[in-house]
A protein has these predicted regions:
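Charged, low-complexity intrinsically disordered segments
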Residues: 24-156
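Bacterial N-terminal signal peptides that target proteins for export
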Residues: 2-13
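Residue-level detector of intrinsically disordered terminal segments
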Residues: 5, 23-24
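Bacterial N-terminal signal peptides
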Residues: 12-23
């Protein structure tokens, strides 16, 4: 009676280990496609609908503009598919403040601002306030510098 119980326990443990590995397998499409994760895997639609930075899930991915985008739900993925330009951050994975200064720095998805229906990401917590102070000038500078620095996307 002891041996069958141990065997069942072992099989149960093996099953649990296999289930625990499923999220790692689900994450494979972004890595195996050779494309970068857009905004480190955060859901771009959630900034607009939930008003917060929300990690996306590997089962809700969509490839667009040389990035793999992740979403918190199938509904968010469908919204993005219908109008990706509306939901994608203005400067991909760039920090908007750094870009306005002519620098290349990766954005942190936790620091963000929506202004005039556009999503901007920043590298530091004070980024949104700093960018907002001279919004028009900063957007113009960042757009100009984005074209000059587009081949230097952070993390490439």
């Amino acid at each position: 009676m002891f041996a069958p119980t141990m065997r069942r326990l072992f099989l149960f443990a093996a099953l649990l280990a296999g289930l625990a590995a499923l999220p790692l397998l689900a994450a494979a499409p972004a890595a195996s496609s050779g494309m970068r994760l857009g905004i480190k895997g955060y859901d771009p639609v959630a900034y607009f609908t939930l008003q917060r930075a929300t990690p996306g899930q590997p089962q809700f991915e969509y490839s667009w503009d040389e990035h793999v985008w992740r979403f918190a739900s199938a509904e968010h993925r469908a919204l993005f598919k219908s109008d990706p330009v509306r939901y994608a951050p203005q400067f991909a994975n760039f920090c908007a403040v750094a870009l306005a200064r002519g620098e290349v720095r990766e954005a942190n998805p936790e620091y963000w601002l929506i202004s005039d229906g556009k999503l901007y990401l920043f590298g530091k917590p004070y980024g949104p306030d700093l960018f907002r102070k001279e919004l028009g000038k900063n957007v113009e500078r960042a757009r100009h510098n984005r074209e000059l620095l587009k081949d230097q996307e952070p993390g490439r």
